[in-house]
Amino acid sequence: MKFGNICFSYQPPGETHKLSNGSLCSAWYRLRRVGFDTYWTLEHHFTEFGLTGNLFVAAANLLGRTKTLNVGTMGVVIPTAHPVRQLEDVLLLDQMSKGRFNFGTVRGLYHKDFRVFGVDMEESRAITQNFYQMIMESLQTGTISSDSDYIQFPKVDVYPKVYSKNVPTCMTAESASTTEWLAIQGLPMVLSWIIGTNEKKAQMELYNEIATEYGHDISKIDHCMTYICSVDDDAQKAQDVCREFLKNWYDSYVNATNIFNDSNQTRGYDYHKGQWRDFVLQGHTNTNRRVDYSNGINPVGTPEQCIEIIQRDIDATGITNITCGFEANGTEDEIIASMRRFMTQVAPFLKEPK
């Protein structure tokens, strides 16, 4: 079993950037004693939904503060930056951390990112796959070049050379298309905290069928499940503290992108639009009902309730790499306290899949 901690870097109403970032930096430093294997950061731009615009800089800070903690990006919005610059950042962090950096990526969902950085959002899937493959191959060969439809440049050597034999990597996968592509490559997925057990199980069944067909040993692919987490002996308190945070956080998420607007005609995001339509039909676009839904499928409650929820997903998917976000717990001290309860009262009692 592996346990990670994910930082959303959300700016709650009434907090300054200085306070939000200061609290997170302090929590980052303190969590090294809590016992997590990996700490993950998320990339966002132009929104209070997430204040971390450059994950390589954030990862360098965290890696420099610690000696044994692994640090990952979950993930770099890969189509919005030059692949060689990203590759150089990955190589430098891999070398300077002596192999403690995990390169996680996402395709991107926020229209402002693509407009500001000059990328066609409708081509984001193809660009992501092209850049990602290019970077992964270059980590093995030490050279990079491209004559694709999306970027062209001559062959060059890249430095520094890799420290790790295989730089750890993953990609957030929500749609069937992304799941299928990652399965063909035999690359690890990150499963979202906004889907329930049955959807996670179906996603893994699809992945495993395709990956096996393409000759990959699925027992050696290290997928990750993510959660919103609040552990407290008082279940109602855990629910309430998450509600206070999530009702603003989820509204911020919806407002950060126009992909959910009925008038939006952006192609290539059918899964996300369909998921939102399902939420509308189920009443989950109402803030309180959306939070109720989130609390119901995530480990929010007593240690026993949290164990039950995570174990159910472990048994359904076979995934034993668990990553939780604790920012919904309130103050820095409350966040650390919930982390400690998780690592002492939940994590030790989770079992390998049946």
UniProtKB/Swiss-Prot annotation:
CDD domains xrefs: Alkanal_monooxygenase
InterPro entries listed in its UniProt record: Alkanal_monooxygenase, Bact_Lucif_Oxidored, Bacterial_luciferase_CS, Luciferase-like_dom, Luciferase-like_sf, Luciferase_bac/NFP
Residues spanning the signal sequence: none
Record-level GO cellular component terms: cytosol
EC number: 1.14.14.3
Enzyme class: oxidoreductase
Catalytic reaction equation(s): a long-chain fatty aldehyde + FMNH2 + O2 = a long-chain fatty acid + hnu + FMN + H2O + 2 H(+)
Pfam families from the UniProt entry: Bac_luciferase
PANTHER family per the UniProt record, alphabetical: BLR5498 PROTEIN, LUCIFERASE-LIKE MONOOXYGENASE
Function: Light-emitting reaction in luminous bacteria.
Name of the featured protein: Alkanal monooxygenase alpha chain
Source organism of this protein record: Aliivibrio fischeri
Name of the gene this protein is made from: luxA
